[in-house]
Every structure is written in structure tokens, then in C-alpha cells.
Amino acid sequence: MTPTTNNKRINFASIKNPLFYPDFLEVQLKSFHDFLQLDTPPERRKKEGLYKVFAENFPITDTRNNFVLEFLDYYIDPPKYSIEECLSRGLTYSVPLKAKLKLYCTDPDHEDFATVIQDVFLGPIPYMTSSGTFVINGAERVIVSQLHRSPGVFFGQSLHTNGTKLYSARIIPFKGSWIEFATDINNVMYAYIDRKKKLPVTTLLRAIGFEADKDILDIFNLAEEVKVTKANLKKCIGRKLAARVINTYIDDLSDEDTGEVVSMERITVVVDREVELTEDNIEAILNSNTQTILLHRNDSNTSDYSIIFNTLQKDPCNSEKEALYYVYRQLRNAEPADDASAREVITNLFFSDKRYDLGDVGRYRINKKLNLNIDPDIKVLTNEDIIEIIKYLIELVNSKASVDDIDHLSNRRVRTVGEQLYNQFGIGLARMARTVRDRMNVRDNEVFTPIDLVNAKTISSVVNSFFGTNALSQFMDQTNPLAEITHKRRLSALGPGGLSRERAGFEVRDVHYTHYGRLCPIETPEGPNIGLISSLCVYAKISDLGFITTPYREVKNGKVDFSDNGLKYYTAEEEEEKTVAQGNAPLDENGRFVRERVKARYESDFPLVTPDEVDLMDVSPTQIASIAAALIPFLEHDDANRALMGSNMMRQAVPLLRPESPIVGTGIEGKLVKDSRTQIVAERGGEVVFVDASCIKIRYDRTADEEFVSFDDAIVTYYLPKYRKTNQSTTIDLHPICSKGDRVEAGQILTEGYSTQGGELALGRNVQVAYMPWKGYNYEDAIVLNERMVREDFFTSVHVDEYILEVRETKRGLEELTSDIPNVSEDATRDLDENGIVRIGAHIEPGDILIGKITPKGESDPTPEEKLLRAIFGDKAGDVKDASLKATPSLRGVVIDTKLFSKAAKKKSRTSTKEAVSKLDETYAKRQQQLHERLIDKLTELTKGKTCCGVKDYLNVELIKAGSKFAKKDLEALDFNVIQLSDWTNDAHTNELIKAVAVNYLKHSKEIEAELRRRKLDETIGDELPAGIVQMAKVYIAKKRKIQVGDKMAGRHGNKGIVSKIVRQEDMPFLADGTPVDICLNPLGVPSRMNLGQIFEAVLAWAGRKMNVKFATPIFDGASLNDMNEWTDKAGLPRDGKTYLYDGGTGERFDQPATVGVTYFLKLGHMVDDKMHARSIGPYSLITQQPLGGKAQFGGQRFGEMEVWALEAFGASHILQEILTVKSDDVVGRSKAYEAIVKGDPMPTPGIPESLNVLLHELKGLGLSFSLD
């Protein structure tokens, strides 16, 4: 058994009790948990997630409101297959979703229609595993969270080509039409609906109820109202009109055809706005029926609002009706039928909660931005919103407000798994509601039930396409535990509703000051996705509204509050205008700052402030980075570009056969292993009762109450995965690190393996390294390795490949798995069993048969008569051909597992199947009976002597009367599926126990039912396989890969290289005490890369190895030079790590001392075995007849245009002709050449290459006729 290792580390952190890290997978698990709310009783469920989807789509009624389908509750049943079975059979790990629906009739004519309550199956929904993944079609997938623009209002500015600043305000809803307000170069404000339809803002204001000019001017308090009298008007001569003077009158028109008289309202403009009052105007105004006129105010305030006057001038409408008609015409390009339909369009756009939804976030953001107090439950736009947005925009135009920073994290929020699923279920349920409504309308007088109305496929098809095809549903990166956990904590700005790589500019990708403690500034991919895909910081959490928060301690009057109340999580918006001190700022024992000036952050600035000015303090210096970056020791000494490479490459480290945790770590390694859920962890205190390589059995401690309510055994068995294939073909292979009789505590790690050792992450090995050139072999970052690394399996890893062969039913008959293959020697099939599958333990070489299969072959499809004769006389489908699966050219390994899945054999008689099924029914009925008896015994004991308070079912029918005593026969008669489990007695504790017992009973009963269904399926249908496939065979081959020349290796500081030479141990440079170094690295790789962390690590780890201790040096708060000197002195090593080395070949001392130390090195997943490839004879492209490209296609090397130039320059005409013809696409020539080589004849003359024919055909396609004479 593996000895347990003491991984207690010496920690150099100045903060001795930093905040505990939150659960690293919380972002996935909590979101999914909140989406389903399964642990919450239906009456207490929050209106979010799945419950909200149902609430939004139900009740469903038919068009006449006769029938109503109401939603009562939803629940899930146990999954049909376990996670392991789904992984091996290629199935989706899902649970059946069922809803309790109530159908009743409101029509008094339908007396015969009884109210029906039914449980309706709505389809299977993929269920998250305990480690935050989904198993879809046998592969583990992760739903990546999306970082997108938050709903709300955004103010921006752009520059016109003539230099004018244009301002805009955009309202982004959760669902519904976008509306944008923007100014133009003429200082007029327009509203754009859905980015295309343009109308003056005043037209929109009229359409939403501000009908007259007066109403619009009153909003902004821009006009003075003057009563129309001759005297008043005379006083105002010379002042400008702020609003039109209009005359409204009724015009009677007679219809020419019918002679009917129609009255129409007519409007005429008496005096236009912006006209000065003169004697002539006054006369006209007095003659109109106007009571008051509006004049410009004389105060300075109105000049700010010139944009409103300009817009009014552009406004073609004078009344609400005209405005509504104008909006309708703009949106629909047609005339409205009547006033109601014109009004409906604008209502539906922004004021209808069915079509428009700002969401909780949108309403919160708008209220916050515009200082409004609108009820958070109002999720549609209000007139107040629109007016305040226009006012803010006017302030922007007058430089009295500032535009929003779109990259500020208060303007971006996270869509987690739960929200993405909520959107998908919303689509699915809306579709389902439509079909339900249609079916209700068709069924007029029939009696029908909810099951008849609901089509279960609608929801599952939407959800399945989301998991299968959405850009955010990704094949999990499972190279090692770090890769897994990072993938689950990733945030992507790409995906539906997000940005696209091509359109994303520099600003979006850049690091922003609000990323501090929220998004890691280091970990992001290199390449086109840089900055668009980022990782959550170690302490970051996502708030209920979807904003990223980070914790700070409050500081009051220069004193840090270390109590639980002093620790709060802040969003980027809440952190604005706060001064934040660094996490390692020196404090005295009372929590006061020691220094008079404190280094702090204030928004994007870094001022030195007095302690009294500090508002908050970081909880830890590690807060700024993500998990991968926080794993790099001495990160503070590395250049950010190299740190980025380092954190990305650690995710590519393959799990080694003998991993070792780093001597110099950062203290986060243990937490990562526990939270990754890849190891087996004790659930609570208990004792190990059995251990072997394949399982661990633990008897957990249970209280008397827990013992009583449980139907489980006290001993829990954990099965250890052995060489399980991961998505990236690495292996998960766990070994126990506990012994029989050990006491275990909650959270204790019981196993190691899969890149962990002693409960800590162990991605690589600690190796002795020398920074010195070695005969030029480490030029350009190449790595020289000691042969000991190969011999002692330092960097040996095991990789498992899965090979699948499907047996189908073809037109010419059934394919068959067999070891009896035509024209194949007995020697080639010696390792195959009777099903043609290779035996476990067989050594595989290239070309070996893995799975033998024969397929019927015929020149043409058999006629029906032939088929009939063959069926009668049992003649096997005539000829068969070999369709076996053979090992690829680079495959060498050992078969570690084989599987065969078959649909139920047709040969089995119906009676034998029936017998087997009835036997199963009997067995499981007996198990259910025993379970029920145990339940009744427990309940009888609990209710002994107690008086009943009334036991009711869901329809409130009393089954055991209140005031009576509990009797065993009464309890036996109860159906626990429909019973209300609360308040059976007066004793609260008894009631809790009754509920717990019944819930546990129901859970076990459902599990037994699910198991019975499974067994019946196996008996009747066999294994679940895709349509058209009769059998499926799988072979797993393990390859043991030692490190070799061409493999890629790296340290944790972005120092990567390719192994260029493996040198015998005796030839490697050695230390004064005779120890040969393990690796020689080029010292020139350090200065220009500026990743000095590797030198610090090498020196400290060397001291650690000498003293047999391990260190934790957290980032930005790690070991100082003094700390390192102290340990190197203790170990008797040079402080700078420089020492004289001796040449392994001659034994002479090298002239200059070299830096020597111990560095943690990883072997990355880019191995030469996967890349090296050479083509002999292989496939050709169909049209050009040239060899294909790439290893996967067994392709050749392209001899391109530039390579041709090179041969032309040398005048190598024969080589050139050969390459361009017989070695490539001269079809006749290449077969002749092959023949000539086999027979030993001279090479034939090359013919015409096929590419010339392709060119000729293309020219013929252009209508040009050619002939080659």
C-alpha cells in the first residue's frame, strides 16, 4: 500500500489566518441546485429557475376559456442508469422530470367533465453530477458561464466624421425589443426601435401619452403659459413661441357611395413654433379658439434644452393619435386598421409583461442609474424611465454627466448554468404550451386528461440540442484535476448573445480595474480568444443578480473589522468610490495600520492614504488571481506573459504514474484536490472497516435518530476507479491512503492518484536542475534530460484509448462479430474470443486485429425472391468480407478492458422472456413489501400512544381522523405518495422523525422501482443502442509512455521546452558530492523572459529537499530573500544557488559556477508519439487525386509552390517531375511505378497529372473547349 506522506508545509505568509477559500465549484453546483430547488418544499419555492418557467407558462387555457390546465408542482424520479453506466454505454445521465398538473372545466354545460390531477412525464433532463459536469452521450461536458452585457440602460458617445460628439442611451432588456435614444449632428434627438426604425423622441413621447407640445415642454419645465387676451399678447410682442398654436375643428364629409355623413377631426396650424409674436400673429391667435399660448422662458436653463425645441421642429405629429399612427407606419410599413391596433403596437413593444421583460437585474440597474424608486416587481418600461433617460441624455449633451464604461464589471453580468437552462426550458415550455392550447381547441366535447394534452418530446428536444450543440456546452478538459476545475470556473464572453472573436476589439479584452479579485488578469488563452475567456478569482462569488463579487474587510477609523460582520462581498458597483488597502498591509494586534501612510487602491488609481481614509481591506493578497495562477510560487517575480503561459500549461500536465507534490507550493494545492471532487472524501466521522485496491468501506457514526429514520446500512462502500479513461485519454487511477481500523473525519481525503499525492495536487516531479548549456543541445529552450528520468519512470504516464466497432443491419444481411474471418491466418486471430473481441491482457502491435467483424458482400442488392429463399434455406448471405477493426500504425499497448453491448436477441422465445419478467416482478414486489413493513414498524413505534392531529392527502381528505389513536392497520392502508407529511401529532420532534422516515422510504421505494424498470428493459430490449445498430463492441488499450526525445515539458513559470537529448547518467554534469543533475536548462531562457520565479523556486526547493521539508509561499505574500537565506544557510547551500559543476564526460570542473536547484517540472499533453507520422501508401483526395493531409487522414506532406521553387533553383528536374507526378496525382503512372518497383524494372515515364485534368474541366466549365494533341 502507498505510504501516507506528511505534506505539512512551512508557510511564509504574513497573514496567518486568511479567509477560507469558498467552494471552488460553487459557481456550477449552487446555480444548478437553485435552478431545480429540489430540497425546497413546493410551497416555499422561490420564483426562480424551473419553478419560474412553469409559473410564467401556466395556467394554459383554450381560446374560449372553457378548459384550464394548472401547474401544481414538479419533481424528479431517480435516474435510469448510474453515471458509470452512462459513461461506458454512451448514454446521457438524466432524470425523468414530472409535473403534477390539474385540468378542470369552467363551462357549466360540461357537467360530466371531472377535475383531473395527474402526474405528467415531461421528458428526461440531463442532471448535474456531484462534480459539476453533465454526462451527454457518454462524454462529460461542462456548461461554461457566460459574461454578457447586463440588462439596463447604457449611455455612450461616438464621434461623427465631422468631429461632432454624438451621445446615445440604449435600453437592453432581458427579453424584448431594444430601444435607443441618440442625438445627431443637427442637435436633434431620435429614438431607434430595434436598431432600425427611427422617429423623433417627441413623437414617441406623444405616443405614450404626452399629447400636446405643452405636455412635452412641461416635462422639462421649458415654457411659460400665457392666457390669450389682447392685452397679454401685446406685452409679449417680440418673444418667440415655444409651441405651435393649432386650431382643431370637426369637418363633416359625405361618403360618395352611400351618402352617409362622416365627422372627422381636422387640425390646422395657426402660428408655427419658434415664430416671434407680431401684430399679425396676435390677430390670428385671437381669431382661433386657443385659450393659452406657450412662450419661451427667459432663464438660462432653457438653453440646455435647445435639443427638445430642435426635435419638436422635426416632429411631424401634433397629437397622440397622429403619433401612434406614425409609429405604426414606421414599424409595420402599413396603415393601422384603427386606433386600438395602433396603440397596441407600442404597448406590446415596451409595456406588456408578456413581450417585454427587463428582469430583476434590468430594473435594479435602471433604478440605480437614474435614481428612481420604481417597484422592483415592475419589469416593463414606464413613462418615468423614458423621461429620465431623455433628461440624462440632455445632461450628457451639456457635459453635466458622464458616459458609462462598458467594460466596467457593473455593466457585465454572468449567465450561470441555471440561467442558461432557464432560458432553454422557457423556449421548450412555450412550445409545449402552444401544442397544449391547440389540442384543447380541437377536443371540444370529449373527456380528456392532462397526459393527452402534453407532448414530452418538445422540452427534451430543446434541452438536448442545447447540451449537444450550444457553444457554451463544452467537452470537458479532463487532462488533470486542475484542468477540470478551471474549465468549470471559466467565464466566456463568446457564445449566443455574446461577442464574436472577429468583432471584439482591444478594450473588451483588456484588463480593467474592476477585475481585481473578480476576474483573473493572468489566466486567459493565448491566440484569438485572449481576454474573451477568463477565469474566476479564488475568492470570487456570483451574486443572485449575476454580478461577480469579491470579499473585503470593513475598515472604520483606521481599524480593520476582523469579525464575521466585517466581512462582506462587494460587486464592482458597490466598490466604486471606496479606498481599499492591500491584504498584507502591516497591522498591530488590535487591527490598526502600523504605518502612517497606507498603499491603497481607489478605482483605477493607487494613492498613498492615511489609515482613516481607508474604507476596505483585501482579505488576502491571493485574491487577485485564479486557481491556476495562484498555484505558481513566486508569481510576483514573473513577467505576466510568462505567468499566463505557466498557468495555461499546468492544465496540460498529464497525470504521471508516480506523481509527487511540489516541494515549493503556494498552500492552495490541498483545497483544490478536495473541491475538484476527483478523490474520495469522507462524508463525516467514522471508521474504515475494509480497504483494498478496488474499494474502501467505512462505518459512519450516526445518532440514534439518524439510525432510526434511515433505511440504509451504516457501512458505505466506495469503489475506486482503476485506469478509467478521461476525455483527453489520460487515466484516473486511484489508490487508498487509509488503512483498516483508521478513524476518519469529515472532509478527509482517502485516496490519491490522478495527479494528486498525499491529498495535494501533484502535476509533475521535483527534479535537480542546472542552468547551463550542454553541448548546444539546449539551444532555443530545448531540454537535456538525465536517462535516470526514463529508467526510474519519473515522467512515465499511462494513456488509454477507446476503440469502438458497431454491428449494423445492412441491406445484404446482418453483420457479425466473429473470430472466423476469411483469408486471415490463425496466428492473427489467436487473441480473439468467440465474439471476435481481443482478450484482456493481449499485447497489441500495429496491424493487429482488435475486433473481428464480417460483413455480407454482394455485387448487387438481393431481390425479394432471393431474400425469401435465403430466409427459408438458411443460406448465410453468400460471400462475406473482412470488416475488422485493426490497430493503427502507431498503436502499441495492452488491452485493459473490453465491453460488448447487444440488443435483446431475437432468438429468445417470448415465453422465456415473459417468465423472466414475471420472476423479476415477484422479486422486486417482495423487496417493496419488506421495505413497507420496515416503514410501518418504524411509524408504529413513533406514534405509539400518540393522539392523531389528522392525516390528510393532497386533496385534503382526512384518512386518519383527528383525535383518534394511531393503529397499525390504519398506517398500512396509507398511500405515502399522496399523503401530507406534516403535523401528524402535537409533538414537533415526532413530526420531524415521521417526515424523515416517510421521505427516506419514498426515496428507497422509487430506487427499487427504477431498478426494476432497468432490469425489465435489459430482459426485453437489451442494451440501449442507437437506431440501426445491433451490437457495439468496445476495446480499451492502455499505453505506457516514458518520456522521450520530442516530448514537451514545462515548469510552472512559463518555461517550456522540448526534450532534445536523453543523456546517460554518467555523462550528465554532477555536483561536488557526485550527484548528477536531472535536467540541464539553457540560462538564456531566463533574462529575456523575465520569469525569475523559477530561480527563487529552484533555490528554495533545493534547501527543502536537503532539509526534507515542504514550503508554502502564497503569491504576493511569499518567502522574502531573508526567509530564503535562512533556509539555504540551514541546509548549508549557497544563498544564490550558484555552485561549481563537473563535466560528466571528463570529470573536469567547469570554469564558472552555475545556478543549481530543484524545480518542479511537468510533462505536457503534447507528446511526440501523437504527432510523429510518416505516410507510405494511403488515401487520395477524390477530385484532385492528390494524397490527403494530416495524421488523422494518414496523409502525406504537401510539396507546395515554394518548395517547387527550391527544386527549380537547384535544377533538380527529375526529382521535381517525380514529385509532381508519380508520387502525387498521376493515377496511371503511380500504379505502374509501384509495379516496376515490385518487379525491379526501370521506372516508367510519368504521365499526365490529374490536377491538369481538373484545370481543364474547370476551363470547360467556363465554356472553353480544349484538346491535348
UniProtKB/Swiss-Prot annotation:
GO terms for cellular component: DNA-directed RNA polymerase complex. The keyword Transcription applies. It catalyses: RNA(n) + a ribonucleoside 5'-triphosphate = RNA(n+1) + diphosphate. This is DNA-directed RNA polymerase subunit beta. PANTHER family: DNA-DIRECTED RNA POLYMERASE I SUBUNIT 2 (PTHR20856). InterPro entries: DNA-dir_RNA_pol_bsu_ext_1_sf, DNA-dir_RNA_pol_bsu_external_1, DNA-dir_RNA_pol_su2, DNA-dir_RNAP_su2_dom, DNA-dir_RNAP_su2_hyb_sf, RNA_pol_bsu_bac, RNA_pol_bsu_CS, RNA_pol_bsu_protrusion. PROSITE patterns: RNA_POL_BETA. Keywords: DNA-directed RNA polymerase, Nucleotidyltransferase, Transcription, Transferase. It comes from the Bacteria. CDD domains: RNA_pol_B_RPB2. GO terms for biological process: DNA-templated transcription. One of its GO terms (molecular function) is DNA-directed RNA polymerase activity. It comes from Porphyromonas gingivalis (strain ATCC BAA-308 / W83). It holds the Pfam family RNA_pol_Rpb2_6. The RNAP catalytic core consists of 2 alpha, 1 beta, 1 beta' and 1 omega subunit. When a sigma factor is associated with the core the holoenzyme is formed, which can initiate transcription. DNA-dependent RNA polymerase catalyzes the transcription of DNA into RNA using the four ribonucleoside triphosphates as substrates. Its EC number is 2.7.7.6. NCBIfam families: PRK00405.1 (NF001616), rpoB (TIGR02013). Belongs to the RNA polymerase beta chain family.
